[in-house]
């Protein structure tokens, strides 16, 4: 039995996907992809699935995702799904299509939130100075 493991990251969210032969079921933390809320996050996760519909029809995917927020997790999941299906099929044309559509389907976005420093409300903003 063929098994492929893949992962994706976005900020502090990490998704790990396991691909096995099956009937096309995709579960995110044991929840079917079709009923994930909010809808915007679901649509974002569906992008690699829609682009490679016939490849996903014979594969069951279990994704465990932790850390981060809702959209960060959605980005991590879509990266894990895209990388995994490419490893499963080995299709160069699909890789080209993913890269042309959105490079972050294949490459994790390593940008992180800048740390807040003292003397202000955020990473760069400073408290207002008064001279009188």
Curated annotation (Swiss-Prot):
GO terms for cellular component: cytosolic small ribosomal subunit. GO terms for biological process: maturation of SSU-rRNA from tricistronic rRNA transcript (SSU-rRNA, 5.8S rRNA, LSU-rRNA); translation. GO terms for molecular function: RNA binding; structural constituent of ribosome. Keywords: Ribonucleoprotein, Ribosomal protein. Pfam families: Ribosomal_S9 (PF00380). InterPro entries: Ribosomal_Su5_D2-typ_SF, Ribosomal_uS9, Ribosomal_uS9_archaeal, Ribosomal_uS9_CS, Ribsml_uS5_D2-typ_fold_subgr. HAMAP family: Ribosomal_uS9_A. Belongs to the universal ribosomal protein uS9 family. This is Small ribosomal subunit protein uS9. It comes from Methanothrix thermoacetophila (strain DSM 6194 / JCM 14653 / NBRC 101360 / PT). The gene is rps9.
